[in-house]
């Protein structure tokens, strides 16, 4: 097994702050290095205060209002999804769309890859985060995986696929209705490319699999490891 190290270091930023009556304020910053590809991430411990200052408390009434106002024109709602969304041709997806439970997958009208599909996760137009059930997420992932297999059958060079999800506008979603996106083709995106190349370099150097070694390290550390479901390890 290779020597996986979680490198991090802390720094402080000092300034005179109007939020503290122009007294000195000190912010703690933590820099973390990715053990595989070496990229650096910065954690600002005071960013939660920035969010609260700029956006205030969550306005649940406003969220409900936006959800209700957007529902009549939502193409992902069950009364619209089969009549207003695009379909795949039979050479890519024999059934034109993929349906698993309440999840329905269809082509993205504005694709960013050779294969780019959207998966409406549920018939319900708006969900609170606590209402995302295991079944809802599992159905969506299964629909996306079925599409991945169909895409590969249509083009065996389409080996680089990702499944992505962001919810509501602060996370970058353009519509309210819960959904996932699955996309890719024969060209990997930068982050995926770096991960694949880093994994190969690690194997050539250590003669072991980085991801198996990472799980072993995480289990021993007992800081982030959650558990295992089938062949899937959760961190």
Language-model-detected regions and their locations in the chain:
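HIT superfamily nucleotide-processing domains
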Residues: 1-235
């Amino acid at each position: 097994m290779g020597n996986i190290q979680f490198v991090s270091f802390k720094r402080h930023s000092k300034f005179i702050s109007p939020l503290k009556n122009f007294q000195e304020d000190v912010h703690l910053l933590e820099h973390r290095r990715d053990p595989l590809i070496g990229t650096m991430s910065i954690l600002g411990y005071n960013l939660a205060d920035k969010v609260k200052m700029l956006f205030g408390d969550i306005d649940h009434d406003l969220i409900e209002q936006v959800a209700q106002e957007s529902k009549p024109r939502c193409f992902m709602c069950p009364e619209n999804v089969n009549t207003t969304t695009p379909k795949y041709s039979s050479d890519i997806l024999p059934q034109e769309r993929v349906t698993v439970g309440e999840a329905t997958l269809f082509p993205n009208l504005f694709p960013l890859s050779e294969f780019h599909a959207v998966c409406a996760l549920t018939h319900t137009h708006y969900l609170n985060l606590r209402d995302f059930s295991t079944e809802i997420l599992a159905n969506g992932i299964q629909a996306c995986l079925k599409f991945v297999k169909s895409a590969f059958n249509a083009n065996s060079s389409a080996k680089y696929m990702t499944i992505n999800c962001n919810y509501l506008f602060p996370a970058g979603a353009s519509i309210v209705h819960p959904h996932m996106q699955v996309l890719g083709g024969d060209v990997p995106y930068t982050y995926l490319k770096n991960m694949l190349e880093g994994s190969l370099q690690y194997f050539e150097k250590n003669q072991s699999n980085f991801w198996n070694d990472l799980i072993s390290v995480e289990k021993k550390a007992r800081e982030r490891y959650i558990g295992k479901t089938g062949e899937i390890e959760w961190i």
